[in-house]
Amino acid sequence: MSTTVLPDTWSRRAKRFEGHAKILAVGTATPANWVDQTTYPDFYFRITNSEHLLEHKEKFRRICNKSKIRKRHLVLTEELLKKNPNLCTYNETSLNTRQDTLVSEVPKLGKEAAMKAIKEWGRPISEITHLVFCTTSGVDMPGADFQLTKLLGLNISVKRLMMYQQGCNAGAAMLRLAKDLAENNKGARVLVVCSEVTLSVFRGPSLQQEDNLLAQCLFGDGSAAVIVGTDPRPGLETPLFELVSSAQTIIPDTDSHLKLHLLEMGLTFHCSKAVPSLITQNVEDCLVKAFEPFGISDWNSIFWILHPGGNAILDRVEERLGLGPEKLRASRDVLSEYGNLTSACVLFILDLVRRKSKKQQQ
């Protein structure tokens, strides 16, 4: 890798495009295997040899019933779990076993979504100038971005950025990065890929760590890809969304409420019961800062692509902001059909929103 440094005025004149980045194509993919949420508690406690934990099983059944999730697509199968029983305990050493699957499945699933986006885009794959890849599933080097470059046959000169362990915020963060790359590199076409495989967090129940049950109920596998660029070529590229601005913020003193740690037992998950309240208490301040420059203060006048961290978050945000029932419909539909897809989730919702818009001719 090499970097050439030029005087500031040269680089601004030569490379920057004065305009907003646009999403030019979207693609999504899921594993063929899927589980029914109503029967999953029976499967989960059977495959983890935990059927004797009757109270725990009933609690898990209640969590699944309240989740408003109908099904989830998963790479893990009963065959895989039977071959690797260390995945079915709570804290047995299993990182190597998980990595063996994740390092191949994450880029493979990412390729499926990327190919769909590239097909919709309709331009030669050689015109992709940048690749931004993110996953919370496993860590490897060379990374999943490198593996995807080979799988797709991208130019060896493609500029790559790999983001690991960014969690649910990563989908929106990848759009922000793609916007910056596209607007600061004239003619750039940025391929963004988010690919998630929840094998990293699957494990048996623990009587001491009950929030583990939430992870087993909530997350699904999937990948999503978008192509971002400026100055779409008339007749050759069709812009779907315009990325006008982006921002990110931290709610102070909340880092202990939502945590994932990569350990010998895999990726552990902790989520406090305060998370929905923390989000709803702060969401309107973020909206005001984002939309005030555009004179927008009616939250029902805009379309919504809200990451569904869980049904409780959607309910509370809707109530707090006085949103009509259709405003978060796409988020609820994606949650129902796929579960929480971590980084890929907002891109699945983005895809659903544009498809519904096209169908309704809006």
Swiss-Prot record:
Protein name in the entry: Chalcone synthase A
Pfam families according to UniProt: Chal_sti_synt_C, Chal_sti_synt_N
Annotated GO MF terms: naringenin-chalcone synthase activity
Keywords, ordered alphabetically: Acyltransferase, Flavonoid biosynthesis, Transferase
Protein encoded by which gene: CHSA
GO biological process: flavonoid biosynthetic process; polyketide biosynthetic process
Enzyme Commission number: 2.3.1.74
Alphabetical list of SUPFAM superfamilies matching this protein: Thiolase-like
Protein family membership: Belongs to the thiolase-like superfamily. Chalcone/stilbene synthases family.
Domain of life of the organism encoding this protein: Eukaryota
Active site: 168
Annotated Gene3D superfamilies: 3.40.47.10
EC category name: transferase
Catalytic activity from the UniProt record: (E)-4-coumaroyl-CoA + 3 malonyl-CoA + 3 H(+) = 2',4,4',6'-tetrahydroxychalcone + 3 CO2 + 4 CoA
Key word Disulfide bond present: no
Record's function text: The primary product of this enzyme is 4,2',4',6'-tetrahydroxychalcone (also termed naringenin-chalcone or chalcone) which can under specific conditions spontaneously isomerize into naringenin.
Pathway of action: Secondary metabolite biosynthesis; flavonoid biosynthesis
